[in-house]
């Protein structure tokens, strides 16, 4: 967390007492997010954390080359709600917490509880299929960003078909493109675990399988 405080200082924010009001903290958050959200993706990925860390150390005339473990750990610190994605809201919460002493954690926890409670309850057979999907997703989410890019999807597709007994299937670039278009519901150019799970559920439903509450019905 000390590294993050250094990042705040290196972003250009100054204060004689080291504190500001909530609006001031939001201004700092916006400045940090816009500076490090390379490509305007709407999120900060592991690769974006590298300059955040190195520039923080540089502001103290120190050189530091973060390892992959350092980068992943830093990303987890920024990811306040633990969904695998660092958004502007995550950065804003950190800025408010450490620049004003005000915490918004309770609100975020409440929102997470609402999100979890509204998630459909699937029967055990479907949950077993989703567990396999989650395991495959984690295997190919090589940078731990919680998102799959083009170069990570081909392997996921191959293993998904293998789980269905089609071990000889090798996806083409066109297959990957079509699958990405189907799965990427928010059109951000990548596929999240939630989007992948939704696609699995829709595929089961199209196959005539009842996915909620009752046992599988073919």
Curated annotation (Swiss-Prot):
Pfam families: EF-hand_7 (PF13499)
Disulfide topology: none
Descriptive protein name: 25 kDa calcium-binding protein
GO terms of molecular function: calcium ion binding
InterPro entries documented for this protein: Calbindin_Ca-bind (IPR051001), EF-hand-dom_pair (IPR011992), EF_Hand_1_Ca_BS (IPR018247), EF_hand_dom (IPR002048)
GO biological process, alphabetically ordered: cell projection organization; regulation of cytosolic calcium ion concentration
Binding site for Ca(2+) 3: 141, 143, 145, 147, 152
Origin superkingdom: Eukaryota
Binding site for Ca(2+) 1: 37, 43, 48
Residues binding Ca(2+) 4: 184, 186, 188, 190, 195
Any Gene Ontology CC annotation: cytosol
Misc note: The 10 kDa protein binds one calcium ion.
Occurrences of domain EF-hand (ranges): 24-59, 66-101, 128-163, 171-206
Record-listed Ca(2+) 2 binding positions: 79, 81, 83, 90
Transmembrane segments: none
UniProt keyword annotation of Repeat present: yes
Keyword Cytoplasm attributed: no
Keywords carried by this UniProt record: Calcium, Cilium biogenesis/degradation, Cleavage on pair of basic residues, Metal-binding, Repeat
Role: Expected to play a crucial role in calcium-dependent regulation of ciliary movement.
């Amino acid at each position: 967390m000390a590294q993050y405080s250094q990042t705040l200082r290196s972003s250009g924010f100054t204060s004689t007492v080291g504190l500001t009001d909530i609006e001031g903290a939001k201004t700092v958050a916006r400045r940090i997010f816009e500076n490090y959200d390379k490509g305007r993706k709407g999120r900060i990925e592991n690769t974006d954390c590298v300059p955040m860390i190195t520039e923080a150390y540089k502001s103290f005339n120190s050189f530091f080359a973060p390892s992959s473990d350092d980068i992943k750990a830093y990303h987890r610190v920024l990811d306040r709600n633990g969904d695998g994605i660092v958004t502007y809201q995550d950065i804003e919460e950190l800025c408010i917490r450490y620049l004003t002493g005000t915490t918004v954690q309770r609100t975020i926890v409440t929102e997470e509880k609402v999100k979890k409670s509204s998630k459909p309850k699937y029967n055990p057979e479907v949950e077993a299929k989703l567990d396999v999907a989650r395991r495959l997703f984690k295997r190919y989410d090589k940078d731990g960003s919680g998102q799959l890019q083009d170069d990570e999807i081909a392997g996921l597709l191959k293993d998904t078909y293998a789980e269905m007994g089609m071990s000889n299937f090798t996806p083409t670039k066109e297959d990957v493109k079509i699958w990405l278009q189907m799965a990427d519901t928010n059109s951000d150019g990548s596929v999240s675990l939630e989007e992948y799970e939704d696609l699995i559920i829709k595929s089961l439903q199209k196959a005539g399988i009842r996915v909620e509450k009752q046992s599988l019905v073919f």
